């Protein structure tokens, strides 16, 4: 048992090291809604933020205060007013907003300052800086309704923020900002986080919600969404009456951020202990990413991919599932291979060997990394190889397999005799291996 834990620790560390190096020196904007701050797991989140800082990541933390503001309004018997799902901040509300936001700022600053206590990094000092880095302006009047002290961002002093980040500080920003006239305005945390991420050219924007991310109809976490897909989710949630949940607020901001140059926005749960670390330091993460370009790419292989392909297929060759290929053979045939890569790891491959005279192609060397065999990568490869075969005028595709007969049959392949093979392939057929021949029409 102890040995298994040690092995798991070593493997986890090996997998995380590339991400530690990748993230060092990058700017992340972390959005903490008021719901996350109220949750019992908040102390762990703060500790993990302190850990990110110790790894050399430049952090801007944006906090919201919606539930705290609502509680403060209720305690003072002041009814909240909304117009078009935006809070109307009258003078009384503004005072209560400033109270709630000010208390949170002090509390979060104190927690971040002591976040590395009771860890091996105890004694390391974290500077937390807040300031008038954002200048606001009023939302104004809409349909005869004056939003009063509800505002929007007018400009951001990104140079001043960068100076603080360069000095090693964590920058903490809340939902209240001043204007050029000295007035205070109530902003939404998603606007603050989104505009900061855009202006600072942040590598990532990270948000917390009550669930683990976005789910599909089967209840599975959707690991990646493109901006148009995320926007569709927002519209669906709003149609269901959800305008203020952590999920919908973050997705709105993530769509804007992604379209404005922020490479990845991550939505994770504030209820899951260690979700921040799992999302940032593992290949598959734990939540949902909004991305312009997928972390997973399917493409033709090049000579630089030989090492990754060999690492993927060697275990299957040793088990007798695949026919052994030497490095030299792979080098000569690399143009026939298609691979799927995830964060520079080759997780699947397949090759297409055409027989132009017979208008038949062979799909061979199909391999999927053990961690991804329960997913649809095999089908993705099959579709890509079939498309490549059609493009070069082939009408049929065959496979030789000893283990995956049913998998191919479920996808339109039927068993055929060896005589159905192209003549040159038939001459090389290994009668000792006794592979089954399955063929599919590409029409």
From Swiss-Prot:
This is Amino-acid acetyltransferase. One of its GO terms (biological process) is L-arginine biosynthetic process. Homohexamer. GO terms for molecular function: L-glutamate N-acetyltransferase activity. Its EC number is 2.3.1.1. It holds the Pfam family Acetyltransf_1. Its main location: cytoplasm. It is an enzyme of class 2 (transferase). PROSITE patterns: GNAT (PS51186). It catalyses: L-glutamate + acetyl-CoA = N-acetyl-L-glutamate + CoA + H(+). The gene is argA. NCBIfam families: N-Ac-Glu-synth, PRK05279.1. Belongs to the acetyltransferase family. ArgA subfamily. GO terms for cellular component: cytoplasm. Keywords: Acyltransferase, Amino-acid biosynthesis, Arginine biosynthesis, Cytoplasm, Transferase.
